[in-house]
């Protein structure tokens, strides 16, 4: 059988199963070792508590209730022997001593974490099982087996205490979800998420509580004593969707972003409703009568709990972002601030009975953009992987201890109550989703289809939050808490096992859109931002203040004030694309210096454009090509005359009062200047000829520039034209054949000879060279480039924006620009 497994699944069970058996055996035998008198450490009395054995958990340090063996003090023993006339015997030096109580708590915690990690490795080694059964189901099964093994050796299995769950296991999962929350999808669907989280949870709680109260009235003697407040409290516990269970299942099926954010966002934001309802009904259960003022205060406490948690999270997020400004010299502690401030936000919210989950989400969302702008790339990687590791281990321990606590807990079974609870949970979820979606689709542009509604209703999983809240119930006020806990475990197991295992085949069967694994391209990002600005402008014109309008307001406020306070240095002013371009240029310059080459130096135009964008940047550290002041000034003139400032949108439109555009006059003047420049260029190109001078200098053909110079090879019988940049506002720079050059052009051998080397070193310009041999009377001379005789040269400067004259049919080949 071992050989068959090794050949089929590609792994060797003997390599991993013995380790698992050793860990399980150690966990089971530790209580046995503890009961055999190994608690003789002096620290054992300080960590021993008085709680019953079933209260022990991974964070609880209580021991078995048996009386410890007290050793007499060595000094008293010596005095006793001396009083009876004996000599004290010398104690032998202990070569090996066992002091397990001294290390019991961290040792057991390490063993449980090691068991969780080995289980995750074992599940993913067997792809057949992991593709069919969700990981959460397998972990619960492992917990059931470990709990049964511990109970089989005669010991009480550890129980998942609520304080351990809420203070140590839940925060890492929520922080990981809040820090890496897809903010765009979350904000765009915030209204839908709030309706599902608030209205849907209230509907489920009261619908389930009311129907269960009716069932208790007719269900028999065992459940007749359950009152309305008891069933409403139970309904508020079991109605909330659990974020841990949703994350564990939805991350494996890779559902699309819309459905994932709707279900997961609902599970995050319904925490405030669950906390308020839980404390409200728990307080009402101890009252003799409940008045209208109590109900109003309970309704008011919902806003206090929700908004108070958000406020606490925002405050700690801002403090964390501000602190990260000053960590540039001590990069090692940067990740620690993220963890500490987030955890402090959660504990501060729990201190005032606010929503700790809302505080964690708010702190993670607020601090992330500013912290990542201040910290190094290595710190960002550390934060990412540590949060993922921490949340994964916590999630694994939660599901394992759900199974262990099921074996360890005391249960009370009632078929009527348990089956009714399970049935009413499913009915309430389906009805709530259908009714709320019908209302939501009236206001949504992208409607939720029936397939989407089915996945949302089917994805309402329950988990450890409901279990921990049920365990917190006081048996004095709620004598049926064991029955409630049994019903909660039944609902959790049904949703995790049945719904969790069947949701993947149903998604494939219904052909629900899956999540795209690839990241969006730069083109998609640019178009997305363009559409955001476009929709913001449309809302401004229409006078409609939608979420695009408020998003634009927040972005402006963020850039103007917040970034300057929370982001260090010039990074708060520099756009991301320009910063990335500057970083790449610096990297290329460093590589260029190290290699000793000159092939990667940025071009002159690129360098000058970047200097204009960053006027305060220090250019001494960058390797730039030498530019003469005249050429740089010439380029600046061209940019000033041809570039225009972007017009700003009007803030609002009113048919009675129109806001004047301050750039309108400058815009009209610029259009006039461009029109004059085009007319001047047209005149230049139309009359670009050399006038005839008797018989020796016939007229030249009209000069033209080819549209694609790289597509042609230079010909010997064509003149060569190069363009020297000049300002279009300076017509004096356009020097058409003046009187001094006429004589040089007409003379055959009077001009200086231009060698090819001098021609290459000379500045660019339109150079026309006349051939040596004169033509016969009545025919045109043809100017050829590169003549061996001493030709005459003539320069014509033209603006870079001039494309040259348009080709006319019937004329010769176009001139080829020089040097291209």
Curated annotation (Swiss-Prot):
<comment type="subunit">
    <text>Homodimer; dimerization is crucial for its function. Oligomer. Interacts with CALM1 in a calcium-dependent manner. Interacts with TESC. Interacts (via the juxtamembrane region of the cytoplasmic C-terminal domain) with CHP1; the interaction occurs at the plasma membrane in a calcium-dependent manner. Interacts with CHP2; the interaction occurs in a calcium-dependent manner. Interacts with EZR; regulates the cytoskeletal interactions of SLC9A1 and promotes stress fiber formation.</text>
</comment>
<feature type="modified residue" description="Phosphoserine">
    <location>
        <position position="790"/>
    </location>
</feature>
<dbReference type="GO" id="GO:0005516">
    <property type="term" value="F:calmodulin binding"/>
</dbReference>
<dbReference type="GO" id="GO:0005654">
    <property type="term" value="C:nucleoplasm"/>
</dbReference>
<feature type="modified residue" description="Phosphothreonine">
    <location>
        <position position="607"/>
    </location>
</feature>
<feature type="transmembrane region" description="Helical; Name=12">
    <location>
        <begin position="449"/>
        <end position="473"/>
    </location>
</feature>
<dbReference type="GO" id="GO:0071236">
    <property type="term" value="P:cellular response to antibiotic"/>
</dbReference>
<dbReference type="GO" id="GO:0010882">
    <property type="term" value="P:regulation of cardiac muscle contraction by calcium ion signaling"/>
</dbReference>
<dbReference type="GO" id="GO:0071872">
    <property type="term" value="P:cellular response to epinephrine stimulus"/>
</dbReference>
<protein>
    <recommendedName>
        <fullName>Sodium/hydrogen exchanger 1</fullName>
    </recommendedName>
</protein>
<feature type="modified residue" description="Phosphoserine">
    <location>
        <position position="697"/>
    </location>
</feature>
<keyword id="KW-0050">Antiport</keyword>
<dbReference type="GO" id="GO:0005739">
    <property type="term" value="C:mitochondrion"/>
</dbReference>
<dbReference type="InterPro" id="IPR006153">
    <property type="entry name" value="Cation/H_exchanger_TM"/>
</dbReference>
<keyword id="KW-1133">Transmembrane helix</keyword>
<dbReference type="GO" id="GO:0045121">
    <property type="term" value="C:membrane raft"/>
</dbReference>
<feature type="topological domain" description="Cytoplasmic">
    <location>
        <begin position="254"/>
        <end position="256"/>
    </location>
</feature>
<feature type="region of interest" description="Disordered">
    <location>
        <begin position="40"/>
        <end position="74"/>
    </location>
</feature>
<dbReference type="GO" id="GO:0045760">
    <property type="term" value="P:positive regulation of action potential"/>
</dbReference>
<dbReference type="GO" id="GO:0006885">
    <property type="term" value="P:regulation of pH"/>
</dbReference>
<dbReference type="GO" id="GO:0070417">
    <property type="term" value="P:cellular response to cold"/>
</dbReference>
<dbReference type="GO" id="GO:0030307">
    <property type="term" value="P:positive regulation of cell growth"/>
</dbReference>
<feature type="modified residue" description="Phosphoserine">
    <location>
        <position position="701"/>
    </location>
</feature>
<keyword id="KW-0112">Calmodulin-binding</keyword>
<keyword id="KW-0812">Transmembrane</keyword>
<dbReference type="GO" id="GO:0043065">
    <property type="term" value="P:positive regulation of apoptotic process"/>
</dbReference>
<dbReference type="GO" id="GO:0086092">
    <property type="term" value="P:regulation of the force of heart contraction by cardiac conduction"/>
</dbReference>
<dbReference type="GO" id="GO:0030346">
    <property type="term" value="F:protein phosphatase 2B binding"/>
</dbReference>
<dbReference type="InterPro" id="IPR032103">
    <property type="entry name" value="NHE_CaM-bd"/>
</dbReference>
<feature type="topological domain" description="Cytoplasmic">
    <location>
        <begin position="376"/>
        <end position="377"/>
    </location>
</feature>
<dbReference type="GO" id="GO:0071456">
    <property type="term" value="P:cellular response to hypoxia"/>
</dbReference>
<keyword id="KW-1003">Cell membrane</keyword>
<feature type="compositionally biased region" description="Polar residues">
    <location>
        <begin position="785"/>
        <end position="796"/>
    </location>
</feature>
<dbReference type="GO" id="GO:0090533">
    <property type="term" value="C:cation-transporting ATPase complex"/>
</dbReference>
<dbReference type="GO" id="GO:0042802">
    <property type="term" value="F:identical protein binding"/>
</dbReference>
<dbReference type="GO" id="GO:0048471">
    <property type="term" value="C:perinuclear region of cytoplasm"/>
</dbReference>
<feature type="transmembrane region" description="Helical; Name=4">
    <location>
        <begin position="191"/>
        <end position="219"/>
    </location>
</feature>
<feature type="region of interest" description="Interaction with CALM1">
    <location>
        <begin position="637"/>
        <end position="820"/>
    </location>
</feature>
<keyword id="KW-0813">Transport</keyword>
<keyword id="KW-0406">Ion transport</keyword>
<dbReference type="Pfam" id="PF00999">
    <property type="entry name" value="Na_H_Exchanger"/>
</dbReference>
<dbReference type="GO" id="GO:0014704">
    <property type="term" value="C:intercalated disc"/>
</dbReference>
